[in-house]
Each structure stands twice: as C-alpha cells, then as structure tokens.
Amino acid sequence: MQRTLLTFALAVLVVSAPAFAQNQPNPQPNTNGTTREGSVNDRRQDQQGRIANGVQSGQLTAGETKNIEGREANLNREIKDDRSANGGKLTTQERQQVNHQQNNLSRSIYNDKHNANQAHYGNNEVGQRRENQQDRIAQGIRSGQMTAGEAARTENREQGINQQTRADRAANGGRLTGQEKRQINRQQNGASRQIYRQKHNNRVAPK
C-alpha cells in the first residue's frame, strides 16, 4: 500500500511540474521592444544598500563614496532621460547598456570596500563627529532620503574637512590646535546642516 501511494505521489509531481513552469514570470522583452524595469530598479536599490553598508562600516572613505555616488547620479540621469524619451520605458538596448554600467559600478563598490583604504576616526571629539556624520549619511542613502547626487556632494564636503584635518595634524605633530579644532567644528556644523536638509527635502532616491 505504501509503495502504491509513493508511486502515485511521484506521478502527480511529474505531471504538475510543466504546469508550474508555465506559470512562472517570463523574463523576455515585451513585444514593443522594451523590457521590464524591475531588475534595473532592484539593482539600483541593492547597490545603494551596499554603499550605505560600506560608509557605515568605514570600508568606504568619503572620497570613494563621493566618486561612486557621482557615477550613480550620472547613471540615474541617463535612465531618467531614456525613459522620458520612450514613454516611461527602457528599450532592450538601453537596458543592456544600463546593465553594463551597473556591472562596472558593482565592481567599483566591491574593489573600494576591499582595498587598503579605510575610514579611521580615532578616539577624539573630531573623529567621533566624523563617524556620527558618516552614520547619518549611510542611513540617508539606505532609506532613500538622500539621492546619489546629494550623497556625492556631502561626501565631497566631508572629504575636504578630512583633508584639512589631516594637514593640520601633520603640521602640528599629530595634534590640532584649539583654533583648528574650532574651525573644523564650524565646518562639521555646516556639513551636519547640509545632511539634515538633504534628508528632509522633497528629493528622494529613485525606486
């Protein structure tokens, strides 16, 4: 009896397999020459999540994030323009081009996160504020409150502060004078306000 039931179950499984396969989504292009947009948008969000993780962990420096997010912003503009020219869709050729660019960006994110460059904050007030601001940027990128362009501009500003801090310390035996600390604090205040404005304006990352 058990053998009969097992044979019957296997027969049902074999018969139902083709029907199950037929019900799965078809990834082929639409008949009008355009392709579904899900994978482009999904990859975009996935890459922003990877960037956010790199920023928060310190694997991506401000300069690296600036460069990557600048490229992401350019790609986003290209996608927007292509869709506007084609009734809100990407053609198959455009999608292939976008996929190629996203592959290049993905490799850059991986390489930057695994190279020798790391964000080092140090156990001091200036370093702790830098780390806090990077965490806020990471949260804004991850949530979509900050666009790629906004993140690139903010990280460009953070990179400038980091370079000045490093130069000031190099000129003073590894320390900052009281005046230099006050100047850096003012710059960090300005960057902090910029982060807040970008996270609370009406611009969000494309979905």
Q: What positions do the PLM features span?
A:
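Short, charged, amphipathic alpha-helical segments
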Residues: A62-G70, T91-H100, A148-N156, T177-R186
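Sec/Tat signal peptide C-region and signal peptidase I cleavage site
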Residues: A17-A21
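N-terminal, post-signal-peptide region of Sec/Tat-exported proteins
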Residues: A52-S84
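Amphipathic alpha-helical coiled-coil segments
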Residues: N74-K89, N104-N117, G160-R175, G190-R203
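Extended amphipathic alpha-helical interaction segments
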Residues: S108-G149, R153-N156
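Short, low-complexity, Pro/Ser/Thr/Gly-rich segments in the mature regions of secreted, periplasmic
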Residues: Q24-Q28, R197-K207
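N-terminal propeptides/low-complexity segments immediately following signal peptides
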Residues: N23-D42
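Bacterial N-terminal signal peptides
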Residues: T7-S16
